[in-house]
Amino acid sequence: MNRQGFIGGSDARRIMEGDWHNLWLEKTGRAKSADLSENIAVQLGVYTEQFNILWFKRHHIGFPSEEHCDHMREQKTFEATINEVPCKGTVDGWIFSKNQILECKHTYDRNTMESCIRQYMPQIQFYMRLADATHCYLSVIFGNRRWEADAVAL
């Protein structure tokens, strides 16, 4: 996938972590992006994303009704130019009846929701800005033992 020419959600995280120079090298074609096709953590997250969305729909308080499920679209891409910088992000789910987004993650079993929120906050805030959303639900599978979801406000 060509990720040059715009800033994305993962890029926002890298910028906030201080990896902006390497990101700039990649975005300008001076360096190659890492190939994540053999990264098991990344691929497991991709593979379990649909299950994570299904679990969120079934178990999130106030969300399991068919009415709400019908108001959710998976994999929506938002684009905007912010301060003359092209930005693009694809959210895992968009709850269009409430203008809220869903981001799904799969992490190790001893991780905490607080740590996940901290780790992904730049990506979440970036997506909320692009989607003009008021909230983002972070739905996280921890290993194979537990699941949690939490709402993050703009």
Describe every region a protein language model picked out.
Residues 1-54, 59:
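Charged, glycine-rich intrinsically disordered N-terminal tails and low-complexity linkers that flank
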Residues 58-154:
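Nucleic-acid nuclease catalytic cores
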